[in-house]
Amino acid sequence: MTFRHCVAVDLGASSGRVMLARYDSKHRTLTLREIHRFVNCLQKTDGFDTWDIDSLEKDIRLGLKKVCNEGILIDSIGIDTWGVDYVLLDKQGQRVGLPVSYRDNRTTGIMSQALVQIGKSEIYRRSGIQFLPFNTIYQLRALTKQQPELTAQVAHALLMPDYFSYRLTGEMNWEYTNATTTQLVNINTDDWDDTLLAWTGAKKGWFGRPSHPGNVIGDWICPQGNRIPVVAVASHDTASAVIASPLANKHSAYLSSGTWSLMGFESKMPYTTDEALAANITNEGGAEGRYRVLKNIMGLWLLQRVLKERRITDLPALIAQTEALPACRFLINPNDDRFINPDDMRAEIQAACRETDQPVPVSDAELARCIFDSLALLYADILHELANLRGEKFTQLHIVGGGCQNALLNQLCADACGIRVMAGPVEASTLGNIGIQLMTLDELNNVDDFRQVVSANYDLTTYIPNPDSEIARHVAQFQPKRQTKELCA
């Protein structure tokens, strides 16, 4: 067969897309077309910040039907989403309540309990995963302690992409790359850790053994009656994005830039040393047995919130105004947990500057400048930290995802990090999703083979560091501006 048609369902924390890929195996050309785009946003339910997954499922099915109605024979479907959040099911496979978002405050103080009762080094030794207050381990503990009446009804817990695959196929699956984000998978066995799971109060029977990317979960029956395989792709969106990052060699790092920024490198072995623990490095699962050694950064969430609060719709115009402002006048620590979900992001940023005796950003452009400069400096700090961890410097940084379209931030990143930046592809998560599908269909050999296809089909933009820029001169003296209770503990 010369042509393959694969559908990627890519759900982010603010929007979702159903994308159609067309792959010409003879010429190794790959094209993407957006079929359906929809909004994903939080809603308040019984005092909790929850996801409207019934609406999301409706949009997923609508997008799939649009493809089928075009007369296209779909070869496979894959679903990727953000990590850590889950859906509860009863014995009949029906949903128990709505899934609570990781941004809900129900986990406040829970991680501190775990550090005392289990021990930080013991949790890290078992999981190899960074300490974030909203990890699934702490969400489940909050659930079992705060809502025991709900817990009694639960028979299964599915992570978000696994839930939507279940709704399409009727088959349950627990995909490995996303499962590792829970901080509940044992890094040595690739299975759920009994000790960590027991601490949450959840039952091990809620979960099946994690499966690695590439297996067929089941079939979705389209309106025309065709049975279409649903593939377990690397269902954590960052895992998919890394698959599509055209990393040149072992000296290349990646930055998946979107609502979250995730900076790291690929490794065939995990890093779980005391140094890695002190730096709060995570070892999330990747495809083909590789590890995504990385750190989480709050990312463009801060900007997204400012845009929403200020009702700004012309982002290019705002960036142009921002570029004209001097650098490094307003600096914050983007990873301060005060920015996870404040009532007013603009006011929170201003308060952080005021508390550190800095000028206070007032205009929208000043707020954006504060966010961009602060992110670039944090990128530089973390890249240096990652290089020290592995004992070898990086020579190139690949920025992928929606954030790679921000030329100003890309250049600031290159200047602050002091290395060449390659930006693109934008649709990295979708492409990585498609890549695993094509491997499952025996159209491609492995991840490296797929990266060659990506490099041949998608243009990258190069940013050369300017050592004389304001932000480059500032790097050496950058420190978070006050003692913060950080997101990355």
Curated annotation (Swiss-Prot):
The active site is at residue 237. GO terms for cellular component: cytosol. The keyword Magnesium applies. Transmembrane segments: none annotated. Keywords: ATP-binding, Disulfide bond, Kinase, Magnesium, Nucleotide-binding, Rhamnose metabolism, Transferase. Pathway: Carbohydrate degradation; L-rhamnose degradation; glycerone phosphate from L-rhamnose: step 2/3. Its EC number is 2.7.1.5. Gene3D superfamilies: 3.30.420.40. Coiled coil: none annotated. The keyword ATP-binding applies. GO terms for molecular function: ATP binding; glycerol kinase activity; rhamnulokinase activity. It is an enzyme of class 2 (transferase). It comes from the Bacteria. Substrate binds at residues 83, 236-238, 296. GO terms for biological process: glycerol metabolic process; rhamnose catabolic process. ATP binds at residues 13-17, 259, 304, 402. Belongs to the rhamnulokinase family. NCBIfam families: PRK10640.1 (NF007925), rhamnulo_kin (TIGR02627). HAMAP family: Rhamnulokinase (MF_01535). Involved in the catabolism of L-rhamnose (6-deoxy-L-mannose). Catalyzes the transfer of the gamma-phosphate group from ATP to the 1-hydroxyl group of L-rhamnulose to yield L-rhamnulose 1-phosphate. This is Rhamnulokinase.
